[in-house]
């Protein structure tokens, strides 16, 4: 049986944990035994000796402990099976289209959703673990030493609960290096088919689980893509930072007359072009390699106009120290996008930077609107989908902001 260390918090440092946050920083602990190895289990007590929870410890990390349980649960195979089964049950209950298509449905009826997040780390009680499902394949990200130590238990639990044909480890996040782990990606169970295609909101989307961004595509935006259904019909649309084109392809599916997508990645643009052809949308979708900042500036100079502009950039704010610099970048692209919109046109604008909260992002959008002297109406304010749940006591779990605005 695995030995479990005991650690104590400094006086007054328990409030965040009692409010539901699962992290403990090194400056909040009185110390830890010298025998501690990265990934060991530890029971956490407050300064008076009251038990608070059980987690794994890594003295090499700024986040020294991540709680797995608020009781003295055994962190064994049954623990992981239970947590993953609970997470899957949550998705089946809360995500609209995970239900199987009924036998009496027409054969051209939409297929049930096959791509979704099964485990969203801390929000599902499994800090440091991401599990995404793509049809019969599963992609995992193990981000911490504590979860890396339990990799085999995790894989066994996934086989028990999800029974995938293949499991791909996408352990290429820089977060692993901060935990003292190397980066790697490989097929760790089963055999991955040479081509994997899943239905996304009625589109057939080919996934590259080994080389694609994140674990294959941006699952946190799948629900938000549907927001275009009310604003894309008949539009001339510009999809910026388009990656493999899913925003633009959804716009075309929902009736956009013409879509132009821009991304600086050649493989992404090749993928977007292929998806447009596969879905019969190539006649209305054009994707090109380009720098979005330069493209927006040049199109503004030429006084081009669009009915719909989509901004879904990568995270500009990697650390709090870079926030002000990143805010300038966010403001520039949103300001130029507003200038490109015809009266009553729509702007879909997103940020996946945790350090840029929703209130600050909204104020930034207001500043941009004021600078271009345009009145702007908020149509929808959204976040990540329900398969990416948010812990109320953990602000870090709420990272995606998505606004649909109408520029009057």
Regions found by a protein language model. Give the residues of each.
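Non-catalytic substrate-recognition/targeting regions of SAM-dependent transferases
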Residues: 119-126, 130-132, 148-218, 226
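Non-catalytic accessory regions of SAM-dependent methyltransferases
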Residues: 1-133
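Conserved SAM-binding loop of SAM-dependent methyltransferases across substrates and taxa
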Residues: 244-257
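Mobile active-site "lid"/loop adjacent to the S-adenosyl-L-methionine
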Residues: 306-336
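Conserved SAM-binding motif I beta-strand of class I
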Residues: 258-263
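Conserved class I S-adenosyl-L-methionine
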Residues: 234-243
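S-adenosyl-L-methionine
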Residues: 269-307
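C-terminal catalytic and target-recognition region of SAM-dependent MTase-like enzymes
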Residues: 332, 346-408
């Amino acid at each position: 049986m695995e030995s479990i260390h005991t650690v104590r918090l400094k006086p007054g440092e328990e409030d965040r944990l009692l409010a539901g946050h699962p992290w403990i920083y090194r400056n909040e602990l009185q110390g830890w035994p010298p025998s501690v190895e990265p990934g060991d289990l530890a029971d956490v007590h407050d300064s008076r000796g009251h038990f608070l929870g059980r987690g794994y410890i890594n003295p090499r990390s700024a986040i020294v402990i991540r709680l797995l349980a608020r009781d003295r649960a055994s962190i064994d195979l049954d623990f992981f099976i239970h947590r993953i089964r609970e997470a899957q049950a949550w998705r089946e209950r809360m995500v609209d289209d995970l239900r199987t298509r009924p036998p009496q449905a027409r054969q051209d009826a939409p297929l049930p959703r096959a791509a979704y997040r099964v485990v969203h780390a801390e929000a599902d009680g499994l800090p440091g673990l991401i599990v995404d499902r793509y049809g019969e394949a599963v992609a995992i990200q193990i981000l911490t030493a504590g979860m890396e130590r339990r990799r085999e238990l995790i894989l066994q639990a996934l086989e028990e609960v999800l029974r995938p044909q293949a499991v791909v480890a996408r352990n290429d996040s820089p977060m692993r290096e901060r935990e003292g782990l190397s980066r790697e990606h490989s097929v760790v169970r089963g055999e991955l088919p040479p081509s994997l295609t899943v239905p996304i909101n009625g589109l057939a989307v080919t996934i590259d689980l080994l080389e694609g961004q994140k674990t294959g595509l941006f699952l946190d935006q799948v629900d938000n893509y549907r927001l275009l259904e009310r604003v894309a019909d008949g539009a001339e649309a510009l999809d910026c930072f388009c990656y493999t084109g899913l925003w633009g392809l959804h716009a075309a599916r929902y009736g956009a007359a013409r879509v132009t997508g821009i991304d600086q990645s050649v493989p992404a643009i090749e993928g977007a072009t292929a998806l447009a052809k596969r879905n019969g949308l190539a006649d209305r979708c054009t994707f090109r390699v380009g720098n979005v900042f330069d493209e927006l500036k040049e199109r503004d100079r030429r006084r081009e106009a669009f009915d719909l502009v989509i901004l879904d950039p990568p995270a500009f704010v990697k650390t709090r120290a870079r926030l002000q610099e990143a805010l300038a970048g966010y403001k520039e692209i949103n300001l130029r996008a507003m200038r490109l919109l015809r009266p009553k046109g729509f702007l879909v604008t997103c940020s996946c930077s945790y350090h840029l909260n929703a209130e600050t992002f909204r104020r930034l959008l207001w500043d941009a609107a004021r600078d271009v002297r345009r009145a702007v109406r908020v149509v929808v304010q959204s976040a990540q989908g329900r398969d990416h749940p948010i812990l109320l006591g953990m602000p870090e779990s709420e990272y995606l902001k998505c606004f649909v605005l109408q520029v009057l």
